[in-house]
């Protein structure tokens, strides 16, 4: 009797095992999706990294690139942000933007990236808006449609953005809470004449249908670019310059072995690099110089 059971169960187990292996093989054959983290104020370093990420994904076999966005604004000018939006608009592969995870923000000029991306989604608890005057890309003003007016001066949560049709992906009330859901959202879409295949369906050992997402490759700023990005925010840059000058003056008026001077010089260099990465404004420079008089 036991032998008969083994004879019957053996092929069934082999079939389910084969289905599991087939599902794994299917996932392996799917082209990967690149995910690029974009966080903090958009400075020249981050703007360059966005453009380079698009070029990299076009050349490394990715079927799409997702920008995970969490930013409260930009310190680059409108012209530089226009170049970033143009790079997204002219990408040869689909570009998706996910404002997430929950609590993330897409404010200021960077929020307008959602208007030119192919697929856009938000996590519940995320907000977008405060875009200011809309930029123009290739002679046409970017737009969120009926949501333009509300987004320029205010902000919208997920449900409001979906209601105003500011997002380019229709989903249920849960939004897109995690990155895996963003991969599910891309599956089956045809963008820029590219049919996205990011999920493979198969039966597991219990006979239940499982969904396996394609391989995800994560990218973010390297050590030096990340350091420069950190010091390129106005508060950090000015604080480093102030500390650097204070330590240099302290070393000048006291007898020491040079530790304060060394630390001050490092802070001053980093602060100067941060200020150099910021967009210049004549009035701001005048106030900065006046502060040290």
Please identify what each model-predicted range represents.
Residues 176-293:
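Non-cytosolic juxtamembrane linkers/loops
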């Amino acid at each position: 009797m036991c032998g008969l059971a083994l004879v019957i169960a053996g092929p069934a187990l082999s079939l389910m095992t084969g289905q599991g292996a087939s599902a794994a093989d299917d996932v392996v054959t799917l082209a990967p999706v690149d995910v690029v983290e974009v966080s903090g104020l958009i400075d020249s370093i981050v703007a360059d990294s966005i453009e380079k990420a698009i070029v990299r994904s076009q050349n490394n076999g990715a079927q799409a690139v997702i920008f995970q966005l969490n930013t409260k604004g930009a310190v680059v000018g409108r012209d530089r942000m226009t170049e970033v939006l143009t790079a997204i608009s002219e990408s040869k592969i689909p570009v998706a933007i996910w404002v997430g995870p929950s609590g993330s923000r897409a404010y200021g000029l960077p929020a307008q990236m959602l208007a030119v991306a192919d697929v856009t989604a938000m996590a519940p608890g995320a907000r977008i808006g405060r875009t200011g005057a809309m930029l123009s890309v290739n002679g046409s003003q970017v737009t969120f449609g009926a949501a333009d007016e509300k987004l320029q001066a205010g902000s919208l949560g997920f449900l409001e953005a979906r209601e105003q049709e500011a997002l380019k992906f229709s989903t249920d009330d849960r939004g897109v809470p995690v990155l895996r859901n963003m991969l599910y959202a891309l599956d089956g879409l045809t963008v820029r004449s590219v049919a996205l295949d990011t999920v493979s369906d198969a039966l597991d050992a219990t006979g239940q249908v499982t969904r396996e997402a394609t391989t995800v490759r994560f990218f973010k700023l390297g050590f030096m670019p990340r350091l420069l990005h950190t010091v390129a925010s106005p508060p950090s840059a000015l604080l480093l310059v102030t500390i650097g000058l204070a330590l240099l003056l302290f070393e000048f008026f006291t007898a020491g072995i040079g530790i304060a001077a060394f630390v001050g010089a490092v802070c001053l260099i980093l602060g100067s690099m941060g200020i150099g990465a910021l967009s210049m404004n004549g009035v701001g420079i005048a106030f900065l110089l006046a502060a040290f008089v």
